Amino acid sequence: MLILISPAKTLDYQSPLATERYTQPELLDHSQQLIREARKLSAPQIGKLMSISDKLADLNATRFHDWQPDFTPKNARQAILAFKGDVYTGLQAEEFSEADFDFAQQHLRMLSGLYGVLRPLDLMQPYRLEMGIRLENAKGKDLYQFWGDIITEKLNDALKAQGDNIVINLASDEYYRSVKPKKLNAEIIKPVFLDEKKGKFKVISFYAKKARGLMSRYIIENRLTKPEQLTAFNSEGYFFDGDASEKGELVFKRHEQ
């Protein structure tokens, strides 16, 4: 079973590390190509491209400039401990045991605009480059064209290594678009999280993102290997709705808090 999640814009390079172990990202040659393109942009151009403030544009221009391909614990941090968004609030990797990190390293992948695919313990230097950004490059007009089949091939390698063919898609649509489902040697299962509001169940972005992290944590902590085991997920009040689910899509609901 391979879990896919999105990265986060918010980063943490300060808090204590839950593990000293680390690995190197596997697609750094490609990352370097993107860094070369990003360095051509001025801070105002970055601000316009990413729709961010002048302050954030300056920060990310500096990050692109400072980025170097030799990753060490001094200039980089394990990806699963560096990302700090809603998904990662649910995941709570800072509480993982070494055995949890072992399982996650094999079964969890973070999709990334700059790094393509990251394993949890892969070192990562700080960056902001969302998958949907239209950064022109040698391969085309955006990052989807840049990555092409590369991300899908890397995921197929991971599935082959674990002798499995189940992908749990907990990534956002923006990031999952970088995967080619028809070329993925897997059965793809997408959990959907609906929260009740005024008597109706719907996707509420903040809650859904956190729930993707909660589900990832549930799989990792319980060492799940079969998709049917996901239906027992009940973190923070969610419950499986078999009637609303269909092939390839598992629906979880939660009553209004």
Curated annotation (Swiss-Prot):
Write out the GO biological process terms: response to hydroperoxide
Q: Where is the signal peptide?
A: none
A Pfam family annotated for this chain is: H2O2_YaaD
Give an example GO cellular component term for this record: cytosol
The record, for InterPro entries, names: YaaA
Q: Which segments of the protein form a coiled coil according to its record?
A: none
Q: Which family does the record assign?
A: Belongs to the UPF0246 family.
Q: Which HAMAP family match?
A: UPF0246
* Protein name, UniProt field: UPF0246 protein Ent638_0568
